[in-house]
Amino acid sequence: MFGLTTLAANKLPLGNMLFIIISFLVLMVILKKVAYGPLTKVLDERAEKISTDIDGAESARQEAENLAAQRQSELADTRQQATKVVADAKASAQKQSDALVAVAAERANTINQQAQTDAEKLKEDAIANAKNDVAALSVAIASKLMQKELSLNDQQALIDAYISDLETK
């Protein structure tokens, strides 16, 4: 056969050839048990770790996106609340301003009414004093007139004065 003729041509004894083949096969079995098994195990573990890391990175990316969306939502809510607080403060300030204006207007109205009342009282007092003065003056004039005889012109002047006094009242 092929193997025997080749061996004869190379002058390698058959026993040596069998020993080399068996040694090679034993070496392959030992390598498979000692090196290939652990090597494939390490490679499988490495592939699993890479897969786990990729899944973890994807999960972290998704969580980061969710947190970013949540932060954006919270920021929008905070801005809306700040806008509402500012609007409420403006409305409150406007209400206080309106209330102060109303109080000031009411106070001014009260002061105006009091001034009108005081003016009316002063006017009435002045009229009463004037009446008293006119009465006193009339009595004085009458007493002087009684002391002297009235002429026609004096009588006419007295009547005109009396009529004009009545018209002013």
Curated annotation (Swiss-Prot):
Assembly behavior: F-type ATPases have 2 components, F(1) - the catalytic core - and F(0) - the membrane proton channel. F(1) has five subunits: alpha(3), beta(3), gamma(1), delta(1), epsilon(1). F(0) has three main subunits: a(1), b(2) and c(10-14). The alpha and beta chains form an alternating ring which encloses part of the gamma chain. F(1) is attached to F(0) by a central stalk formed by the gamma and epsilon chains, while a peripheral stalk is formed by the delta and b chains.
HAMAP family, alphabetized: ATP_synth_b_bprime
Record's subcellular location: Cell membrane
Annotated InterPro entries: ATP_synth_b/b'su_bac/chlpt, ATP_synth_F0_bsu_bac, ATP_synthase_B_chain
Main location: membrane
Matches recorded under NCBIfam families: ATP_synt_b
A single GO cellular-component term on record: proton-transporting ATP synthase complex
Keywords per UniProt: ATP synthesis, Cell membrane, CF(0), Hydrogen ion transport, Ion transport, Membrane, Transmembrane, Transmembrane helix, Transport
Gene: atpF
Superkingdom of origin organism: Bacteria
Pfam families attached to this UniProt entry: ATP-synt_B
Record keyword Transmembrane helix present: yes
Molecular function (Gene Ontology), one example: proton-transporting ATP synthase activity, rotational mechanism
Similarity comment text for this entry: Belongs to the ATPase B chain family.
Role: F(1)F(0) ATP synthase produces ATP from ADP in the presence of a proton or sodium gradient. F-type ATPases consist of two structural domains, F(1) containing the extramembraneous catalytic core and F(0) containing the membrane proton channel, linked together by a central stalk and a peripheral stalk. During catalysis, ATP synthesis in the catalytic domain of F(1) is coupled via a rotary mechanism of the central stalk subunits to proton translocation.
Membrane topology field: Single-pass membrane protein
Transmembrane segments: 11-31
Protein name: ATP synthase subunit b
